[in-house]
């Protein structure tokens, strides 16, 4: 997301792998009027007005589009405050988080090798 300040941008993920084009259209054509001329600090009001004004409320296309915009606004706000977003949202609550990795390969041996690489990276603790 671009701002009126040169070089100040925000990044957000609006991934909807089955329908990327409608998400782009939702951002460009539907959400843009809710964003233009607004202050980054108005994140909650932007979200609420965008969400409740929509005919497609709670649908996957709008939810993905709005999620990406919301993330980008928080990214911009963090840059303006010179703080990581997690500090803006209350601070770090843990040193690490569980992750899921998927080993793949053309042969069973390749899968085993990739799994060993993930284990060596520390992605498996043996706990759930």
Predicted regions and their residues:
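N-terminal amphipathic alpha-helix/helix-capping segment at the start of soluble metabolic enzymes
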Residues: 50, 78-79, 83-96
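Metal-dependent enolase-superfamily TIM-barrel catalytic cores that perform enediolate-based chemistry
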Residues: 90, 95-128
């Amino acid at each position: 997301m671009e701002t009126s300040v040169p070089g100040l941008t925000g990044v957000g993920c609006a991934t909807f792998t089955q329908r990327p084009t409608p998400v782009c259209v939702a951002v460009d054509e539907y959400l843009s009027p809710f964003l233009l001329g607004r202050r980054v600090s108005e994140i909650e009001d932007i979200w609420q007005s965008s969400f409740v004004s929509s005919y497609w409320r709670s649908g996957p296309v709008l939810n993905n589009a709005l999620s990406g915009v919301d993330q980008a606004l928080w990214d911009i706000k963090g840059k303006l405050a010179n703080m990581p977003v997690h500090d803006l949202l209350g601070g770090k609550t843990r040193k690490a988080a569980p992750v899921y990795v998927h080993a793949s390969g053309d042969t069973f041996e390749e899968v085993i090798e990739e799994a060993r690489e993930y284990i060596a990276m520390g992605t498996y603790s043996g706990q759930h």
